[in-house]
Amino acid sequence: TAEEALKDWSAAAADYLWILERDPNDAAALYNLGNVRGSEGDWNQSLELYSRAADAQPGFAMARSSAALAAWQQDDLSGAEAELRKLIRRYPLFADARAALSGLLWQQGASGEAESHWAAAAGLDPRYRQRDWLLEVRRWPPQPTRQLMAFLALEDG
């Protein structure tokens, strides 16, 4: 919504809540409300909303990837890794999941596998190198963004 573009989170949330009052399973509204809650720093609520969006529309890969990122933000590394690996098996060309798994694996010390996933992600979508794009447009949580940027700093250094 325009409110999201203006970072008016309460107005944006009100728009999505209005939609959800009429259709509690509207996957797009659930996902977008998850983005709003994440932008407000409420990653627990964000995770719940992304998961509900993915359940409402099972092929909604971005909702599942966002749920994995929110789980990672809350230190559920094993849950995040499992979900990202499932996404990559199902959608091998899904750059978001590959980029996220790169940062997560690097954080866990698996640098070789991280580099392998990053090679695929970078070839699919070079925007994942851009911190501001990750935070402001794609709206990754701070922890995954920091880890991916740290990984890339070593790769570039």
Mark where each language-model region is.
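Canonical tetratricopeptide repeat
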Residues: 9, 30, 64, 98, ...
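Position-specific recognition of the canonical hydrophobic site in helix A of tetratricopeptide repeat
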Residues: 1-4, 21, 31, 35-39, ...
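Structural signature of tandem alpha-helical TPR/SEL1-like repeats
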Residues: 5-18, 39-52, 74-86, 110-117
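Helix-start (N-cap) detector for alpha-helical repeat units in TPR-like alpha-solenoids
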Residues: 27-28, 43, 61-62, 95-96, ...
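TPR/TPR-like (Sel1-like) alpha-helical repeat modules
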Residues: 72, 85-95, 99-129
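Terminal, low-structured helical/coil segments at or just beyond the last alpha-helical repeat
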Residues: 120-157
